[in-house]
């Protein structure tokens, strides 16, 4: 391998032996360029136009991995490509030594990824090039923290960063990102901007992070979560995810690859996600989260789930448009899955959630807006204002008397519970529910009430515009105080 040039601040990977022909394994040359930059205090590692077949790339402090327009990092298939010594092109999963049973393997192990870093500062991945995870697995191959034989030697994430600070990911495109396109755990003071991702599993997983902005991103994930915040036990302790600001993003659930090629083929109604979610891993909880000026199309909507004994509070959502909504537009829930240390006895909780200026059309009739707490620990203080939802309709009269399952220890996914008793809003175990300037409509006749409140107190409903069929009440209260609806 070539020795490389004198340090100039820019380290062209071709000067370190990279070919960029899509056939030669170039990750050793890329890693050599990174090490050369580090030896000289950092710099830009430049990938000019070409296709760079790669295994694991190890990011280091003060390095910018710059993938220029026309350049592609292509994840190698470990069954077809080996390192010079015959070993896997992907690094082995690191030793965890903590509590791997408290989160999925994808949240436990980072080194078995295409691009990874741990404990680094001031790193960036930039440029208008592409990361193509063709050779990555999209399976969670290390369930319950056990490195199974089938997972050894594979790469399962496009970008995996742990305990890093001052991270910037900007302008790149990720296609087929493996299990997670980007996972950042315990990474503070970071920015993701103008990133496009078109993948079959999770797009962005932001776990146990603080002080982060995510802006101007296009995220297409038909089979899993698009942009998900988590607070898992991956750092061997409960860490809150907080001070996260997300704006000007497009979230979709088109068939994988069709956002990038411009054909935009919708997936059929079924397990289509593409949603924005908090959870499910939620040991540390969430605080001070803002989502604004985002669009959703052919995807599920907003999901806020606290089920692992954390606290979810101070959540603000505004200026959201959705079209062709699968499963549900808005879902807020707490539960007691409690996947974490048994000595933690404090229950999950949620409070102070404000959602405003939302318009959504062609919403699946299976689920209304859902706000459900627990019998002994209700959700406190939810504001829903200036909301317009247009449903497909089709609900029957019998559904209002349906016993809608308690969340309890169940996995928090509304479609598993089936039809909601209301077509517009179903709330249970809530104290402080404030509805203002809300409109619901349906396309086909729907014989459910617009709103069903079960064990809900301190309710205000102001300017509710929600028609019902003849003989069907607009608002039904079950084990709740009677609620006056104020019309202007």
Residue positions per predicted region:
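Extracellular/periplasmic carbohydrate-active domains that bind, remodel
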Residues: 1-488
């Amino acid at each position: 391998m070539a020795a490389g040039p004198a340090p100039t601040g820019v380290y062209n990977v071709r000067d370190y032996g990279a070919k960029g022909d899509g056939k030669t394994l170039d990750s050793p040359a890329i890693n050599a360029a990174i090490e050369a930059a580090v030896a000289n205090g950092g710099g830009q590692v430049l990938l000019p136009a070409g296709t760079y077949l790669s295994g694991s790339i190890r990011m280091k402090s003060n390095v910018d991995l710059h993938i220029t327009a026309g350049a592609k990092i292509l994840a190698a298939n470990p069954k077809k490509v080996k390192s010079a010594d015959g070993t896997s092109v992907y690094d082995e999963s690191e030793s965890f030594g903590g509590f791997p049973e408290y989160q999925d393997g994808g949240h436990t192990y980072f080194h078995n990824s295409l691009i990874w870093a741990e404990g680094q500062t001031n790193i960036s991945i930039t440029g208008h090039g592409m990361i193509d995870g063709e050779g990555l697995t999209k399976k969670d191959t290390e369930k319950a923290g056990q490195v199974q034989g089938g997972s050894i030697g594979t790469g399962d994430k496009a970008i995996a960063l742990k305990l890093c600070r001052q991270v910037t990911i900007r302008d790149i495109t990720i296609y087929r990102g493996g299990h997670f396109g980007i996972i950042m755990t315990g990474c503070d003071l970071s920015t993701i901007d103008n990133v496009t991702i078109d993948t079959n599993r999770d797009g962005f997983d932001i776990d146990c992070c603080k002080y982060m902005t995510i802006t101007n991103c296009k995220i297409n994930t038909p089979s899993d979560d698009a942009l998900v915040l988590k607070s898992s036990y991956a750092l061997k302790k409960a860490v809150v995810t907080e001070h996260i600001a997300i704006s000007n993003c497009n979230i979709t659930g088109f068939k994988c690859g069709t956002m990038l090629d411009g054909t935009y083929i919708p997936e059929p109604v079924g397990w289509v996600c593409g949603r924005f979610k908090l959870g499910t891993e939620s040991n540390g909880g969430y605080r001070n989260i803002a989502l604004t000026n985002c669009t959703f199309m052919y995807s599920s909507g907003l999901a806020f789930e606290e089920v692992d004994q954390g606290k979810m509070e101070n959540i603000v959502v505004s200026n959201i448009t959705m079209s062709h909504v699968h499963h549900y537009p808005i879902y807020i829930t707490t539960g007691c899955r409690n996947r974490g240390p048994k000595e933690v006895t404090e229950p999950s909780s949620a409070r102070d959630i404000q959602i405003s200026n939302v318009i959504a059309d062609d919403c699946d009739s299976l689920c209304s807006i859902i706000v459900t707490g627990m019998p002994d620990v209700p959700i406190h203080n939810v504001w829903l204002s200036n909301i317009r939802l247009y449903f497909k309709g089709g609900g029957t009269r019998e559904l209002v008397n349906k016993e809608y399952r308690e969340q309890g220890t169940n996995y928090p996914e509304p479609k598993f519970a089936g039809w909601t008793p209301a077509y517009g809003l179903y709330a249970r175990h809530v104290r402080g529910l404030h509805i203002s300037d809300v409109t619901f409509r349906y396309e086909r006749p729907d014989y459910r009430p617009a709103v069903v409140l079960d064990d809900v107190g301190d309710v205000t409903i102001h300017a509710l515009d929600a028609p019902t069929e003849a003989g069907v009440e607009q608002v039904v209260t079950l084990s709740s105080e009677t609620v006056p609806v104020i019309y202007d």
